[in-house]
């Protein structure tokens, strides 16, 4: 029995002994990539969540809270609407001749003149806003037989009764109001905008006291259009002490065309025209303060940076702005797939390369080498493969911004109650566009992320194959991203492998000799398993033989009696 125990002990020592080649005659070289303890989750085409070492947020979700006055010219409407400034409301006289890129209307704006309405308010507001100017040219209209410059206590200019400065209220002269027929040709080479109106008295008595006739009529024509308006006499809700109203209309006269005005009463006549310009100017409702700063993109919430391709601050924008999307976040991968390092390994406790996990602490590159040789252990980055990956990734964000950032503005849409169907259709179209852009944005980012991860994986594989081609039969692929080098390889040798100057032939004979010696005695884990199973089987067989012999011996001595019955 003692002999068997001794042999078993010797056998176990033989199995557990250090293998030849784990001394200074071999080295280990592993290839790996950068990793971080806590990566960032991004979405790809194939995965909803995949962890990468670094990612950039693509959605701007906050504003500065203020509107920057540079590089866009911002005109603060203060307490005036654009239409009030256009008509010449007394408290808006400061805006005469003003120009702007963006006119900012405030919620506190109010009218302080004769009560009026504009049947096509949204179109007029948008037209004037895009022109970017309130430049007004007075013309010499001749109104014979009527009283001009009518005014009202509801529209005081200083202590006196007044009226809109750009309009001329015509009333009867003595007891007559003749038929007016005035023409005004456009001999210039630009469009002219004429603002005019019609007065709706609250009573028949007011109608005749102002215009003599029981009902007036206003017709304004050009070669391209004609509008005939008849006043609607009747009481309306009281505003600033008045129950009568004025309706404002507008006509554009092209170069070479003629403006014709015909009326027998109730006419609010133009005093001249606004010079129309084509441009990128616009208007926005906002209560954000205007500050001295620089920003290309403006929203009602305030200016926002345009260094991201998407934003979800506001659908209404002006300038070079990111596209509005519904998502609160879209992350673009700007690093590789993250596989955190298994901390229990130590540097070379159980050496492993990129196939098993990444390496934390690689601050000078994305890809690199770790080695273990007779001089110790070390690590170095591979700058060439790192730079190749970075160069291809760096342009991604700029390309996405170029695809989405355009010089455009999304203005507010306004519709009257009778245009409810148009408003519903417009809202549906806008919502559909936003849904489409949101889907496209998510798809675009997922595609770019997939490409980034595939790209960085490819660079790792290229570096591994490059190293394999250098080492050839001088080393063995260990299957985990590492090579077992079968010759003595000091730090200079390791450096030659990293920089591509390794000479395979110099070490060939030594590597073949060491490989032969090691392979001759090396027991792989598979052979150990076979030996253990064979040993177990032999032990069981010997135990059975001993037991059977003991039974036969006792039977011969008569100590055991065995009866076999059939």
Curated annotation (Swiss-Prot):
Glycans are attached at residues 24, 38, 54, 181, 301, 499. GO terms for biological process: clathrin-dependent endocytosis of virus by host cell; fusion of virus membrane with host endosome membrane; fusion of virus membrane with host plasma membrane; viral budding from plasma membrane; virion attachment to host cell. Residues 17-530 are extracellular. Palmitoylated. Residues 1-16 form the signal peptide. One of its GO terms (molecular function) is host cell surface receptor binding. It is found in: Virion membrane; Host apical cell membrane. It is a single-pass type I membrane protein. Disulfide bonds join 30-482, 68-293, 80-92, 113-155, 297-321, 489-493. Keywords: Clathrin- and caveolin-independent endocytosis of virus by host, Clathrin-mediated endocytosis of virus by host, Disulfide bond, Fusion of virus membrane with host endosomal membrane, Fusion of virus membrane with host membrane, Glycoprotein, Hemagglutinin, Host cell membrane, Host membrane, Host-virus interaction, Lipoprotein, Membrane, Palmitate, Signal, Transmembrane, Transmembrane helix, Viral attachment to host cell, Viral envelope protein, Viral penetration into host cytoplasm, Virion, Virus endocytosis by host, Virus entry into host cell. The record marks 345-346 as: Cleavage. It comes from the Viruses. The chain crosses the membrane at residues 531-551. Residues 552-566 are cytoplasmic. Its main location: virion. InterPro entries: Capsid_hemagglutn, Hemagglutn_HA1_a/b_dom_sf, Hemagglutn_influenz_A, Hemagglutn_influenz_A/B. Major glycoprotein, comprises over 80% of the envelope proteins present in virus particle. HAMAP family: INFV_HEMA. Belongs to the influenza viruses hemagglutinin family. Binds to sialic acid-containing receptors on the cell surface, bringing about the attachment of the virus particle to the cell. This attachment induces virion internalization of about two third of the virus particles through clathrin-dependent endocytosis and about one third through a clathrin- and caveolin-independent pathway. Plays a major role in the determination of host range restriction and virulence. Class I viral fusion protein. Binds to sialic acid-containing receptors on the cell surface, bringing about the attachment of the virus particle to the cell. This attachment induces virion internalization either through clathrin-dependent endocytosis or through clathrin- and caveolin-independent pathway. Plays a major role in the determination of host range restriction and virulence. Class I viral fusion protein. Responsible for penetration of the virus into the cell cytoplasm by mediating the fusion of the membrane of the endocytosed virus particle with the endosomal membrane. Homotrimer of disulfide-linked HA1-HA2. This is Hemagglutinin.
């Amino acid at each position: 029995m003692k002999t068997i125990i001794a042999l078993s002990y010797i056998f176990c020592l033989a199995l557990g002994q250090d293998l030849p080649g784990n001394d200074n005659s071999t080295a280990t070289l592993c290839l790996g990539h950068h990793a971080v303890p806590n990566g960032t989750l991004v979405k790809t085409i194939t995965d909803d969540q995949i962890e990468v070492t670094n990612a950039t947020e693509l959605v701007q979700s906050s504003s500065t809270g203020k509107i920057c006055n540079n590089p866009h010219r911002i005109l603060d409407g203060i307490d005036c609407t654009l239409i009030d400034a256009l008509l010449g409301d007394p408290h808006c006289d400061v805006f005469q001749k003003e120009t702007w890129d963006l006119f900012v209307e405030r919620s506190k704006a109010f009218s302080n003149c004769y009560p009026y309405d504009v049947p096509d308010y949204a179109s007029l507001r948008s037209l004037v806003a895009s022109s970017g100017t309130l430049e007004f040219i007075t013309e010499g209209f001749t109104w014979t037989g009527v009283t001009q410059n009518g005014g009202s206590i509801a529209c005081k200019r200083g202590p006196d009764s007044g009226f809109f400065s750009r309009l001329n209220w015509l009333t009867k002269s003595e007891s007559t109001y003749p038929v007016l027929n005035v023409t005004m040709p456009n001999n210039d080479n630009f469009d002219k905008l004429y603002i005019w109106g019609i007065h709706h008295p609250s009573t028949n008595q007011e109608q005749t006291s102002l215009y003599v006739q029981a009902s007036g009529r206003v017709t304004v024509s050009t070669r391209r259009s004609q509008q005939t308006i008849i006043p609607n006499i009747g009481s309306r809700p009281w505003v600033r002490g008045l129950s009568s109203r004025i309706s404002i209309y507008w006509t554009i006269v092209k170069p070479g065309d003629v403006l014709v005005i015909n009326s027998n009463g109730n006419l609010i006549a133009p005093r001249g025209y606004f010079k129309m310009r084509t441009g990128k100017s616009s208007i926005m409702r906002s209560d954000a303060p205007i500050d001295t700063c620089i920003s290309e993109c403006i929203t009602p919430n305030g200016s926002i940076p345009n260094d991201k391709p998407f934003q979800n601050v506001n659908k209404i924008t002006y300038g070079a702005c990111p596209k509005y999307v519904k998502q609160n976040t879209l992350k673009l991968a700007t690093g590789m797939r993250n596989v955190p390092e298994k901390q229990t390994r130590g540097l070379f406790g159980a050496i492993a390369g990129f196939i098993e996990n990444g390496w934390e602490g690689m601050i000078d590159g994305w890809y690199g080498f770790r080695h273990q040789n007779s001089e110790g252990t070390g690590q170095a980055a591979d700058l060439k493969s790192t730079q190749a990956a970075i160069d291809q990734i760096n342009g991604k964000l700029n390309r996405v911004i170029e695809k989405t950032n355009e010089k455009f503005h999304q203005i507010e849409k306004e519709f009257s109650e009778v245009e409810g169907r148009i408003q519903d259709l417009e809202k549906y179209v806008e919502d559909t566009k936003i849904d489409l852009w949101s889907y496209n944005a998510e798809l675009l980012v997922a595609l770019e992320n997939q490409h980034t991860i595939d790209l960085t994986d490819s660079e790792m594989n290229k570096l591994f194959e490059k190293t394999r081609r250098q080492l050839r039969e001088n080393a063995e692929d260990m299957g985990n991203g590492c090579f077992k080098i079968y010759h003595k390889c000091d730090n200079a040798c390791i450096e030659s492998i990293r920089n591509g100057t390794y000479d395979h032939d110099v070490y060939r004979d030594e590597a073949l000799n060491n490989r032969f010696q090691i392979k001759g005695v090396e027991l792989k884990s598979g052979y150990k398993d076979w030996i253990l199973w064979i040993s177990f089987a032999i032990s069981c067989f010997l135990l059975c033989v001993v037991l059977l012999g003991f039974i036969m011996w006792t039977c011969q001595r008569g100590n055991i009696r065995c009866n076999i019955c059939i």
